[in-house]
Amino acid sequence: MRKLLVLFLSFVTAIAVAQGIDANTAAKAITAAGLKEHLSIIASAEMQGRETGTEGERKAAAYLTSQYKKFKLKPGNNGSYSLPFTLYQDKVVSSTLKVNGEPYALDKDYWVNASSAPQKSLKTNAIIFVGNDFNDKSTVDVKGKLLVATESKERSIYKIMAAQKLGALGMIIIANNNPSYPSNLTGRLSLKPSAASNFVSMTVSKSLGSRLLGGSKDFSDQELADVPKAVYTTTIDWTAERSNGEVLSADVMAVLPSKEKTDEYMFVTSHYDHEGIKNGVIYYGADDDGSGTASVVAIAQAFAEASKKGFSPKRNIVFMNVSGEEKGLLGSQYYSEHPVYPLEKTSVDLNIDMVGRIDPTYKGDSMNYVYVIGEDKLSSDLQPITDKVNKNYNMELDRRFNDPKDPNRFYYRSDHYNFAAKGVPVIFYFNGTHADYHKPTDTVEKINFDLMEKRVRIIFETAWEMAMKEEMLKRDLPLNMPGR
């Protein structure tokens, strides 16, 4: 009788504890101090900027794994917290470039994606300047010609793709002096060895661009905009030598298992890689995307603590920090092509990429905001849930970047996209860009942790709603993925 009484009281206590857990209470485990503790490690000098495939990134992965083990979350990949993959790197070992007989230096005056370098050499005596609005509707005869274009808000890859489609020999992009070009363009990584291409392309400095277009001095932005679209007599002599290599990287995965819908999943994601070290300077990546990575860890911790008090999700919650985002969303692409869990049984991906800062649009009293991107694309269930959760926080949920005509195309620029491309509903949480974006000055000291706490609590409560929903999210909106 005594044993039955003890069992009965234990059962009643368990029910009472479970009933006492709600999302808003559980979210209070996420604090500004806790976020700062995690981010101060993730974006520390010890992590060396966390470039994909480097020792610094491996240290960051080890830290993430240690936290998930500490929270007693299960390994996310068949008994392992690591989902390893191989990336292929084609490098330009050496290159020479002469324009009208004058030599120019690789990684100073021009930058080359190895797969777009000439097989051996390229010589031409004429170029066609097509400005900043070139597209595949152009009526200019570009077949077999080398084109020169200027950057615009639209990504340059679309101009390059248009040039290839119209049969051009290649395209030169005149840069807006973006300091991230060297690492982004030389030695680019990919999930497959790149095939040799007959189409060539390179990015050049504004100074070299001015010489290509006949300028004896560097053009100002306005002077460059006023250059006529025409054929220019310019002699180009370009050679290149390439090499191939492999880089090993890994996504980090942990899971809070469900006891109910054991074959259904939802994801909370971030990317933990950044830009590494350039010219001896560490690019810390505190906001991009140390903030998202610290957020995923804090959300995982809050769910783990709630589970100790009786919370049990209706479907499995997967916490994943991916690598290779800065190299082209490669870690999430690898997962989408080699999923550990069926994508058709994955209800949603909540992706967190840059949530610790304030962009120039918001300042002062108006900084109580977060950009919410992608919730209108695949499921009509998403926005009502987001709005319901926000009633506890009264934050400005800014949806301006959902506009398909927005030139920034942020929807295509973070890891949720690879889930969406497979039909999985997504929400991307984002604070917008700022002056320290992709610069070594993106440091922990500039993070607004009080605002970050509020943003992350909203994401946590949204994840809670997704985890406890009786049915998976409807996929009732058309899958329209024009490509990045």
What residue ranges belong to the model's regions?
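Bacterial Sec-dependent N-terminal signal peptides
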Residues: 1-23
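Soluble metallo-hydrolase cores and metallopeptidase-like ectodomains found primarily
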Residues: 20-23, 109-137, 194-285, 301, ...
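Noncatalytic luminal/extracellular "stalk/propeptide" segments of secretory-pathway proteins
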Residues: 48-143
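Extracellular/luminal Protease-associated
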Residues: 105-200, 283, 301
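His/Asp/Glu-rich mid-to-C-terminal helical/loop segments that flank catalytic regions of hydrolases
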Residues: 301, 434-484
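Short helix-loop-beta-strand segments that form the rim/entrance of peptidase-like active sites
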Residues: 301-328, 349-352
